[in-house]
């Protein structure tokens, strides 16, 4: 295999990928829930993943205090990223409102088409009741006249 300084190697891309891979591995390790076997024996049980053999029954009082809901993180948003997220949320809410309006308009159009078809069918039934079946006087192609092929 060619070395790092070989001419035909996409060196920068390769180095960037390996760097990103190692960073993502570290990030995943920080964010994943630790198993009991990977932590110390005296670690609090609420911070580790449950074992499959652990009981799923709920104890009323275990003596441990529950963890607070607010968790302090070291990840901060830059001003630019915060603006981008706010802008995207605004666009998403506008898009959802537009989709709701379009759905309502679509339902109105479908109802009007359905009403037109219903009206046409009822008119046809009423005309049939008033006038009877319509028969053409020429009778071409019917059993009343001469069949021609």
Swiss-Prot record:
GO terms for cellular component: cytoplasm; nucleus. The keyword Disulfide bond does not apply. The keyword Nucleus applies. Residues 30-41 have a biased composition (Low complexity). Residues 1-58 are annotated as: Disordered. GO terms for biological process: ribosome biogenesis. It is found in: Cytoplasm; Nucleus. Keywords: Cytoplasm, Nucleus, Ribosome biogenesis, Transport. Component of the nucleoplasmic and cytoplasmic pre-60S ribosomal particles. Involved in proper assembly of pre-ribosomal particles during the biogenesis of the 60S ribosomal subunit. Accompanies the pre-60S particles to the cytoplasm. Belongs to the ALB1 family. This is Ribosome biogenesis protein ALB1. It comes from Lodderomyces elongisporus (strain ATCC 11503 / CBS 2605 / JCM 1781 / NBRC 1676 / NRRL YB-4239). The lineage of its organism: Eukaryota, Fungi, Dikarya, Ascomycota, Saccharomycotina.
């Amino acid at each position: 295999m060619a070395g790092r300084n070989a001419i035909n190697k996409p060196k920068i891309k390769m180095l960037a990928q390996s760097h990103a891979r190692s960073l993502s591995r570290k990030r995943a390790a920080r964010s994943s829930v630790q198993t009991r076997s990977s932590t110390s024996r005296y670690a609090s049980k609420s911070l580790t993943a449950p074992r499959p053999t652990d009981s799923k029954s709920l104890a009323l009082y275990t003596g441990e205090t529950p963890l607070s809901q607010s968790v302090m993180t070291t990840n901060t948003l830059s001003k630019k990223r915060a603006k981008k997220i706010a802008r995207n949320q605004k666009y998403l809410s506008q898009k959802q409102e537009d989709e709701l309006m379009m759905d309502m308009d679509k339902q109105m159009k479908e109802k009007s088409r359905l009403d037109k078809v219903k009206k046409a069918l009822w008119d046809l039934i009423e005309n049939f009741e008033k006038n009877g079946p319509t028969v053409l006087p020429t009778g071409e192609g019917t059993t009343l006249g001469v069949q021609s092929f």
